Structure formats: C-alpha cells, structure tokens
C-alpha cells in the first residue's frame, strides 16, 4: 500500500482535511512563482499544529542549499523535494530525507480534462525517458527517493496530465528506477478516478497529488477523501 502525499497545502483547514482523511505526508511549496506558494511563517504555523507521524515535505526549485536549510529549520521539515536542475549532492549536509523530481513526457491529454495549471514556472528539469547517469553515481545521503512527474508543452511539474503508465517506454523507465534501488513516488495528473489504475500499473512506494484534489484552484475536502480512499484500496493480484 503506497504512502500518500497531499501537496500544495496552503491553510490549516486543508492540512486538517488531509490528515483526517489518512494522508501520510503534506507538501508545502516554497517556489515563489508557484500559484500554490506558501510563506514559510504560514507553513510553520500549520506544521506546529500537526499531529505526530505526519511527514512535512518542502518543495523547492533552484533554491540554494543555504535558503533550503533556513526553511527546513524554520518550518521543522523532515523532507525536501527538489524540482529544478539542482545537484542533490549540494544538499547532502542537510539532515532531512531528500527526494529528486524527474520529469517524464506525459500522455496526450484527452481534450481539456484537467482543471490544473502548472505549479512551477521556473522548473528546468528536462523531460526524458531515461535517467541521467549522474543518478547512478550519487554518494550516500544525497538522495532517498525519486519523484516522477509529467511534462507537457514545455512545462515540467504540476501539469495535471497523467503519465503514459501503459507504454513500454514508461515501463522500461520504471525498471531503470527499480535498478537504482530508490523508492519511486508517482505524481503527474493523479486524481480520484485514475489513482487505483496508476498504482496497479506502477507499484510505487508513494503517490503525490495536488491539482487532482482541487476544485476551482483550492483543495476540496471530498476530493481528498475520495482520492485517499481509492489509493488505500487493495490492488488485485
């Protein structure tokens, strides 16, 4: 059963909805040009009121290790998620779990089926169907997991468009990730209607959703509950 992260939390109410529905982790976006950006002091207040055993993930793009370290300390984050072209080795000294986002070309969108707008206007992670060799050469403590997101129209991250889970090239990519031994966190266009199929086809360590549990650009309590309920269903053999 995968761990579930609700990303783009901006209010205490949204955090409470996610926790009550059974989320394992909450994501706070510290990318200034994201529409889901949250001020560190606001995130800190939300985090101070969370129950124990909920992971607190800070999402960054092209931020210096010093800047990330300050927010980690201020907000008591236990995980950072890097969405730019950062070298994970530069953040090795930070005593947190480190996740690196990797962008994979998305499946064609069937019409205008998503309410999502891109989260990150500054992300420069180049979409590719193969992992860079540098991922194979990282020293210990530099990386603890790979988050796989979708890219479309020159945008990477937060596109709201699903990944091509069924295709041979995508399945081959999953094998590459598996060979590295890093846990896979699946993102990219997940929603309550497709999450169970996505889990069955990819068997990820975790899943990450933001726009898929929103209505009119804000988190929706019923969508969060439905998403987590679907993700918790036991997959058939």
From Swiss-Prot:
<comment type="pathway">
    <text>Amino-acid biosynthesis; L-tryptophan biosynthesis; L-tryptophan from chorismate: step 3/5.</text>
</comment>
<keyword id="KW-0028">Amino-acid biosynthesis</keyword>
<protein>
    <recommendedName>
        <fullName>N-(5'-phosphoribosyl)anthranilate isomerase</fullName>
        <ecNumber>5.3.1.24</ecNumber>
    </recommendedName>
</protein>
<dbReference type="Pfam" id="PF00697">
    <property type="entry name" value="PRAI"/>
</dbReference>
<dbReference type="InterPro" id="IPR001240">
    <property type="entry name" value="PRAI_dom"/>
</dbReference>
<dbReference type="InterPro" id="IPR013785">
    <property type="entry name" value="Aldolase_TIM"/>
</dbReference>
<keyword id="KW-0413">Isomerase</keyword>
<keyword id="KW-0822">Tryptophan biosynthesis</keyword>
<comment type="similarity">
    <text>Belongs to the TrpF family.</text>
</comment>
<dbReference type="GO" id="GO:0000162">
    <property type="term" value="P:L-tryptophan biosynthetic process"/>
</dbReference>
<keyword id="KW-0057">Aromatic amino acid biosynthesis</keyword>
<dbReference type="InterPro" id="IPR011060">
    <property type="entry name" value="RibuloseP-bd_barrel"/>
</dbReference>
<dbReference type="InterPro" id="IPR044643">
    <property type="entry name" value="TrpF_fam"/>
</dbReference>
<dbReference type="GO" id="GO:0004640">
    <property type="term" value="F:phosphoribosylanthranilate isomerase activity"/>
</dbReference>
């Amino acid at each position: 059963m995968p761990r579930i992260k609700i990303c783009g939390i901006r209010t205490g109410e949204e955090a409470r909805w996610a926790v009550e529905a059974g989320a394992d982790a909450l994501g706070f976006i510290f990318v200034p040009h994201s529409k889901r950006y949250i001020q560190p002091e606001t995130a800190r207040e939300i985090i101070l009121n969370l129950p124990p055993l909920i992971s607190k993930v800070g999402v960054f793009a092209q931020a210096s290790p010093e800047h990330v370290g300050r927010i980690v300390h201020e907000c008591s984050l236990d995980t950072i998620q890097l969405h730019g072209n950062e070298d994970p080795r530069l953040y090795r000294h930070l005593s947190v779990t480190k996740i690196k986002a990797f962008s994979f070309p998305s499946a064609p969108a069937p019409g205008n089926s998503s309410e999502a707008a891109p989260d990150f206007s500054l992300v420069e992670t180049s979409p590719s169907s193969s992992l860079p060799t540098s991922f194979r050469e990282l020293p210990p403590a530099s990386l603890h997991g790979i988050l796989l997101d979708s890219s479309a129209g020159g945008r990477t991250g937060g596109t709201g468009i699903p990944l091509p889970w069924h295709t041979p090239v995508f399945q081959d990519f999953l094998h590459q990730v598996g060979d590295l031994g890093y846990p896979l966190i699946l993102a990219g266009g997940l929603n309550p209607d497709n999450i169970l199929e996505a889990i069955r086809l990819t068997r990820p360590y975790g899943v990450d959703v933001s726009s898929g549990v929103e209505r009119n650009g804000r988190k929706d309590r019923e969508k969060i509950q439905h998403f987590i309920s679907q993700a918790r269903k036991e997959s058939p053999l």
